[in-house]
């Protein structure tokens, strides 16, 4: 059975559940698939989710967090001759770095919807951000995304977990939860191999 589109996965969820005697939950399949994808967004970080923003707009040591950002992967600063890592730390340490009067930035933290840098970027210093972005969910209006094309089993097993919870079927929930975790781990292993091989897919805004 093909599993590359929303309709494919929706059909598979219904078919798999029918095999265990659940023929009356088709109307809720959309919810199960959406909940599965929300869980994926929380638990998985894969190269196709990476986006590079070059030359962040920073005012008074602060930059707005991109609206689609899930998590920061890497921040670097550079001045035309050298580049260096900007490390994530606590707000206390960022504040202390700001008060130090040294050249920067060397550290950052996320606070109230902003990236705060310490010390504030020195004159002539630019900052690049690599972050993990949300991948648009598959739905009746969006038939495919990266997960449905390359890891559809993650969406399917996650949806079956949610459906099993809905049906109060603990045995099925445990079975599909194990399959979901195995599929997630396979993705993480694949990412690790790709990073060691130096083949990352980064999209530039």
Task: Report the location of each language-model feature.
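Glycine-enriched, solvent-exposed interface loops adjoining structured elements
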Residues: 1-205
């Amino acid at each position: 059975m093909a599993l590359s589109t929303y309709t494919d996965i929706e059909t598979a969820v219904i078919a798999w559940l029918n095999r265990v005697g659940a023929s009356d939950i088709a109307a809720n399949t959309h919810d199960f698939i959406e909940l599965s994808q929300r869980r994926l967004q929380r638990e998985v970080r894969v190269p196709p989710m990476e986006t590079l923003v070059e030359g962040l707009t920073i005012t008074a040591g602060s930059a707005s967090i991109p609206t689609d950002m899930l998590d920061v992967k890497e921040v670097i600063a550079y001045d035309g001759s050298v580049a260096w890592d900007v490390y994530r730390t606590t707000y206390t340490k960022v504040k202390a770095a700001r008060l130090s009067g040294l050249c920067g930035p060397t550290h950052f933290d996320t606070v109230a919807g902003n990236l705060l840098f310490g010390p504030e970027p020195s004159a002539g210093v630019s900052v690049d951000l690599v972050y993990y972005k949300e991948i648009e969910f598959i739905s009746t209006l969006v038939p495919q995304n990266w997960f449905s094309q390359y890891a559809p089993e993650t969406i399917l097993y996650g949806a079956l977990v949610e459906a099993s919870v809905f049906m109060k079927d603990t045995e099925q929930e445990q079975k599909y939860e194990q399959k979901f975790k195995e599929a997630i781990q396979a993705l993480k292993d694949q990412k690790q191999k790709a990073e060691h091989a130096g083949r990352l897919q980064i999209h530039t805004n």
